[in-house]
Amino acid sequence: MKGINPFYFYIGMALILASIVSILLITKSILLFILLAFGSLVGITLILIYISRKILKIDKGRLKKEVKRIFGNRVYKILRLMLVLGYAGFIYFSGTFYNSAVLFFIFIVAFTISEFYKTYRIRIYEKGILIEGIAFYSWEEIEKTTNKDKNQTILKIKGIPKKIVINEII
């Protein structure tokens, strides 16, 4: 694999967002919040630019197909959403409900709900697969099986929890 695993990249983004909001809740300094948010945005942008340039230099071969698929397990997302809402309910009924805590929970719930609809753009090349433009996997790293009855190709990539089903034999 060359690049960043897109599944863990988005989890890292959620942790960065949670840490920024937590620091805001602790310090209550809007200047520190703006500096952290801007610094994180610049850092992530620089990392993405570096990785995309690095991946552009890789010899991928000819583009065969481009598909969009959803990764992740919906059961874990629902459990995480229930945990966050349960914690929000606990804080609400304990009487220590702050406006900043409301914002924090709105961010986490919105991020979790948005993951239900997150689709990844997958480009299939002769020499491998490019996911979201930030991760390139060669065919040696991918476990590929075909289901000729349903005319499907099933790809299992290490580090991505869900199999990718393509409605065409590659």
UniProtKB/Swiss-Prot annotation:
Q: Which domain of life is it from?
A: Archaea
Q: How does it sit in the membrane?
A: Multi-pass membrane protein
> Which segments does the entry list as coiled coil?
none
**Location within or outside the cell:** Cell membrane
Keyword Nucleotide-binding on entry: no
Keywords annotated in UniProt? Cell membrane, Membrane, Transmembrane, Transmembrane helix
* GO cellular component terms attached to this protein's record: plasma membrane
Primary location class: membrane
Bilayer-crossing residues are: 6-26, 31-51, 91-111
Similarity remark:
To M.jannaschii MJ1249.1, MJ0210.1 and MJ0785.1.
Protein name in UniProt = Uncharacterized protein MJ0795.1
Gene source species:
Methanocaldococcus jannaschii (strain ATCC 43067 / DSM 2661 / JAL-1 / JCM 10045 / NBRC 100440)
Q: What is the lineage of its organism?
A: Archaea, Methanobacteriati, Methanobacteriota, Methanomada group, Methanococci
